[in-house]
């Protein structure tokens, strides 16, 4: 069985984005057409379906590296921030975009929060989380997409036919 680990991201992510759009798992918010995706970007994304592509990339990262949190995802999707004459520094991606996408994926039942422990807060007990991991339904969707693009992958990358 082909899994998400066997397919390169350049083939897998567009196919997963299309499957998620058909599945109605995520939808682009109204404000998403006006925002940048990271502090190191100068303009909003040019693609009309960039929200689905980002959500697919987030789901792939959770499937491969989960449990993973919003901060680690923001660092992974960030880039190189141009500081002019000073040296470039790492720029992180928008946590609001990542958090909203994760909330939509949670509502669709594709990811879930991983509770770690309960600590005592000012207002009572507070649940702490280690990030999000993929659910069985999310794993089924991801593996189904990986299996559907297997032939295309084998034609582009001949060495992958052993998987």
Segments from the language model and where they lie:
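Short amphipathic alpha-helical elements of helix-turn-helix/winged-helix folds
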Residues: 57-65, 76, 101
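Short, amphipathic alpha-helical interaction segments positioned at domain boundaries
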Residues: 122-163
């Amino acid at each position: 069985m082909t899994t998400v680990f066997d397919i390169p991201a350049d083939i897998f992510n567009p196919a997963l984005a299309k499957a998620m759009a058909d599945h109605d798992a995520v939808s682009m918010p109204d404000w998403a057409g006006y925002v940048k995706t990271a502090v190191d970007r100068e303009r909003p994304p040019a693609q009309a379906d960039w929200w689905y592509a980002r959500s697919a990339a987030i789901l792939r990262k959770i499937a491969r590296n989960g449990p993973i949190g919003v901060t680690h995802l923001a660092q992974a999707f960030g880039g190189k921030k141009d500081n002019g004459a000073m040296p470039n520094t790492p720029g992180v991606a928008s946590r609001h975009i990542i958090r909203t996408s994760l909330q939509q994926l949670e509502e669709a039942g594709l990811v879930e929060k991983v509770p770690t422990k309960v600590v005592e807060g000012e207002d009572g007990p507070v649940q702490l989380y280690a990030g999000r991991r993929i659910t069985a339904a999310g794993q089924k969707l991801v593996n189904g997409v990986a299996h559907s693009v297997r032939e295309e992958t084998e034609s582009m990358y001949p060495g992958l036919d052993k998987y």
